Curated annotation (Swiss-Prot):
Name the UniProt record assigns to this protein: Probable serine acetyltransferase
UniProt GO molecular function: serine O-acetyltransferase activity
Biological pathway: Amino-acid biosynthesis; L-cysteine biosynthesis; L-cysteine from L-serine: step 1/2
Lineage of source species: Eukaryota, Viridiplantae, Streptophyta, Embryophyta, Tracheophyta
Annotated keywords: Acyltransferase, Amino-acid biosynthesis, Transferase
Catalytic activity: L-serine + acetyl-CoA = O-acetyl-L-serine + CoA
Family according to the record: Belongs to the transferase hexapeptide repeat family.
Enzyme's top EC category: transferase
Species: Pseudotsuga menziesii (Douglas-fir)
Length: 14
């Protein structure tokens, strides 16, 4: 993950 507010690899990883 690049950023907590960005959907990058895992959309559910936040």
């Amino acid at each position: 993950i690049a950023n907590v507010f960005a959907v990058d690899i895992h959309p559910a990883a936040r």
